[in-house]
């Protein structure tokens, strides 16, 4: 309806770890680009922010409730004992919001989350984040915004899935393209 050509990535094609998702984004940029705008939500937004730091060309990002600081967020949500058990066993089962089935996540995911949770971005970026997000705290996006002069944030009365705010996408894209 907006007349946009969209390339949708299978983010887990190379694995669940964040570094694998970063690889997926870089492959798309290298093989299918150039793109006018790179857009991702939650872990996809975090993967895009990490992927673009290696590129000097002018890339534009729209990130929807990006999972910045995911190591700290998950650690707080599951607690020290479960975190220790996950590290010891090497795998943990989660039931992601909106999914029909459980997902088993390797501990290497958390190792990546610690290393890649706060990327440096030198590309024009707009973040859309809901004030009611109960998955990724909005404060994570605020901290990220303060770390770069290239980042703006739009805060909305919405949750993590941003279902009530998708009509803003056209404006967000305009913000990074203007």
Over which residues does each language-model region extend?
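Active-site catalytic motif of lipid deacylating hydrolases and related acyltransferases
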Residues: 1-32, 160
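Nucleotide-sugar donor-binding loop of glycosyltransferases
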Residues: 10, 42, 131
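Generic hydrophobic alpha-helical segments
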Residues: 21, 25-29, 48, 169-176
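Acidic-histidine catalytic/liganding microenvironments
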Residues: 32, 55, 148
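The alpha/beta-hydrolase serine catalytic core
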Residues: 37, 58-178
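Active-site signature of alpha/beta-hydrolase-fold catalytic machinery across serine-
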Residues: 50-54, 143
